Amino acid sequence: FAIVKAQAGENWHEFVLWTIGQNFGGLENMSLIPGNVGTTPVQNIGAYGTEIKDTFVSCDAMTIATQEMKTFTKEDCHFGYRESIFKHEAKDQFIITSVVFKLTKRNHKINTSYGDISKELEKQNVTTPTLKDVSNAVIAIRQSKLPDPKELGNSGSFFKNPIVPKEQYEKAHALHPEMPHYVVSETEVKVPAGWLIEKAGFKGKRFGDAGIHKNQALVLVNYGNATGQEILAVSRDIQATILKEFGIAIEAEVNVI
């Protein structure tokens, strides 16, 4: 394994590309996620079947109140689906200064089973994908579905994919047989929030300068002058509609300040 320490201010995507260039595996499925390295443990960011917690070793953080340094291990961080201690007990108390990852140097576990990665690799005529091939596929998918925040205001995926009890999913599935899902455990199922939002008719809709992106229903966008309250109002309308139509509650993935 390779133990790699990255400073918090490093651009995340550039860091991922650097690890691939060194033939270090584990982060390639999270290519092109906007932001810096230091923010990744806060959200336990993830994409296409991979999360930060899969390769995370520890992070150093400065206590805001005392300027003392503290090291958080993986166990300390209480990672969950887009969750960590930094969103709850330790919220607004620390500034992460660096993050340590444990990456593979050989016998990489290439993960192409999630989302559209295998389809994209097939389109590119790749049969035995490398780390770089997976990264390129993820980049192509994200660029085709997600708007560039520099060109169209957005915060990426606005909602988490809900994880629901199997019985609850089966009730919703009986009414909507085409509803996709991913098995999380014997008792829980993950449902794509983007599918629910699109099925409810929100994809591509615009409410003044706030709206839902035409290519990816998980992304709320600001067409220019929408206020935070207007974006929030659209998100709550979506949540209420999904709950009413499918009996499934979807939570915001973003942090609302």
Give the positions of each predicted feature:
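Anion-binding (especially nucleotide phosphate/pyrophosphate-binding) glycine-rich loop
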Residues: 1-66
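Hydrophobic side chains in well-ordered alpha-helices
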Residues: 15, 231-234
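Generic structural marker for isolated residues within well-ordered, non-membrane alpha-helices
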Residues: 16, 193, 239
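Hydrophobic pocket-lining residues that define ligand/cofactor binding sites across diverse proteins
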Residues: 19, 242, 246
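Beta-rich strand-turn-strand
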Residues: 24, 228-231
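Phosphate/pyrophosphate- and phosphate-bearing ligand-binding catalytic cores of soluble enzymes
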Residues: 69-221, 225-229, 245-257
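Transmembrane alpha-helices
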Residues: 234, 240-241, 250-252
